[in-house]
């Protein structure tokens, strides 16, 4: 049975991709990061998300893969992405289809605010 967890920037499926289709799997999790391209990603930042995903999956090792556990992993990854944005590791993609600033308004340094919001 296909389980999924969908947040704004993370989609997790208990499935593998075959011929561009999701095929349910009891052994494979498929991760889709930022499907709407809301952020600008460097390879390092994307790898941080993948490592965090691996760490979270490992933390559930030996437990049943339930809808609840999958949603917790997705939620934890969503919070991790927020932390990357706050640290400046990623930024909003101003060429995105929709600019909704779902993780908060961008912070732009000015001489008056320099260093105050770190």
Curated annotation (Swiss-Prot):
Subcellular location: Cellular thylakoid membrane
Entry's EC annotation: 7.1.1.-
Keywords of the record: Membrane, NAD, NADP, Plastoquinone, Quinone, Thylakoid, Translocase, Transport
Membrane topology: Peripheral membrane protein
Top-rank EC class of the record's enzyme: translocase
A GO molecular function held by the record: quinone binding
Assigned GO CC terms: plasma membrane-derived thylakoid membrane
Location (main, coarse): membrane
Catalysis: reaction(s): a plastoquinone + NADH + (n+1) H(+)(in) = a plastoquinol + NAD(+) + n H(+)(out); a plastoquinone + NADPH + (n+1) H(+)(in) = a plastoquinol + NADP(+) + n H(+)(out)
Domain of life: Bacteria
Record function comment: NDH-1 shuttles electrons from an unknown electron donor, via FMN and iron-sulfur (Fe-S) centers, to quinones in the respiratory and/or the photosynthetic chain. The immediate electron acceptor for the enzyme in this species is believed to be plastoquinone. Couples the redox reaction to proton translocation, and thus conserves the redox energy in a proton gradient. Cyanobacterial NDH-1 also plays a role in inorganic carbon-concentration.
Subunit structure: NDH-1 can be composed of about 15 different subunits; different subcomplexes with different compositions have been identified which probably have different functions.
Family according to the record: Belongs to the complex I NdhM subunit family.
Alphabetized HAMAP family for the sequence: NDH1_NDH1M
Protein name: NAD(P)H-quinone oxidoreductase subunit M
Organism: Rippkaea orientalis (strain PCC 8801 / RF-1) (Cyanothece sp. (strain PCC 8801))
């Amino acid at each position: 049975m296909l389980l999924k967890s969908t947040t704004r920037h993370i989609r997790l499926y208990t499935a593998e991709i075959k011929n561009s289709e999701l095929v349910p799997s009891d052994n494979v999790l498929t991760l889709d990061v930022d499907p709407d391209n809301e952020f600008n990603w460097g390879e390092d930042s994307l790898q941080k998300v993948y490592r965090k995903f691996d760490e979270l999956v490992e933390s559930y090792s030996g437990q049943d893969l339930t809808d609840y556990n999958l949603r917790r992993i997705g939620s934890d990854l969503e919070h991790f992405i927020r932390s990357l944005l706050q640290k400046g590791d990623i930024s909003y993609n101003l060429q995105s289809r929709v600019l909704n600033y779902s993780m908060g308004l961008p912070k732009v340094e000015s001489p008056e605010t320099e260093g105050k919001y770190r």
